[in-house]
Amino acid sequence: NNVYGMQVLLEAMVRHHVDKIVFSSTAAVYGEPKRVPILEDDETNPTNTYGETKRTMEKMMKWVSRADGVRYVSLRYFNAAGALDDGSIGEDHHPETHLIPLILQVPLGKRDYITVFGDDYPTPDGTCLRDYIHVIDLADAHVLALEYLRKGGESNIFNLGNGKGFSVKEMIEAAKKATGKDIKVEMGARRAGDPAQLIASSEKARKVLGWQPRYTDVEQVIGTAWTWHQKHPDWYQD
């Protein structure tokens, strides 16, 4: 349980005089945004349970910071994606829920088609828009956030994204180019709680942390994931 786990962690930190924490949060805390790109001080109004738990965890850190002096950085990930360039480390979820691995399961022969959940959203092609950020860029941000706290930085929140949205259909087309293979698509109904678009403004992280994403081309991001999947066709079970 996210919330209970955070309670136990924060209590242990206070008890053992650990006064800094870098937290992996999520863009899901925003829910359906009133504007894009999203800024860190925009309203948070989650539309799913996951986002609500992360927002609650952020609030818990805020109160512990005030009461006990624990300083925190909350990194609000947008859509984490990709793998190490050499294909040694990648995504392995059971069941898989992330879009890029699900798309790549089709050219891998693990599924017959990818389902697109809804094509009637208020976006250019009717499918959801998301901002994809490579895992290496996320790792870089974590190191910078820790350095920021070690240098005395105050508690803070940062968005982590590339600042550009790609639709589900665009991601499928990019995957076709990255893999050189056709990908069959079937349409499905909308999923409850899916915002039409989530696109970050990460200017604050760039200015305050000095963060500079290295993977800004979505086809390149998908390409790193494809390399991992080709080397691990049965995931880490092989």
Which residues fall in each region the model found?
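Active-site proximal helix/loop that lines the substrate pocket
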Residues: 26-29, 82-85, 121, 165
